[in-house]
């Protein structure tokens, strides 16, 4: 069976069609996925999840031209869950990573993500109530053909560069890892963070400064 791989988008859509109607990609859909998947995560884990969620849906739309346009994007464990609303922290996570997707060799990856097992304070694995730890991959330090694909998708798919574990990402963030390092922890050292063009762009420098400040404020608040 041949794979259908669409043309790589240069620009992110402003809106996407979902089972909840038309939503702004950056201001509604991505924040609501972060809320639906891991509402109470550390800010850096939320930022990592926002990038993974954005990549996941845009890659799916790339290869299924009707998805998000005439075919509604679903919400559920078979795709990714989006909540009815989003907290301010989830909105910020989407805002500071606006337009950023994960790529390998110039193509968006699948960017699978699951809950995975909880992690204990000492860094050992805890319980796995969702039975999804089996899909999580640990690819820190790996590149190219050494990156472990996830069994959640076809292993031979060129975009299969592993799977993020949300609880592990939260633990990593609590240890001081930033969202870029968290993403490479699961998807490999050679994963590319690429910014798509957008009519809503506020500028890299301004957004970066706002992002650092916002994440720092939330992080300080969470530690109190």
Residue ranges and their predicted role:
Residues 1-211:
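Conserved, single-site charged/polar hotspot
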Residues 206-223:
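Terminal signal-anchor or tail-anchor transmembrane helices
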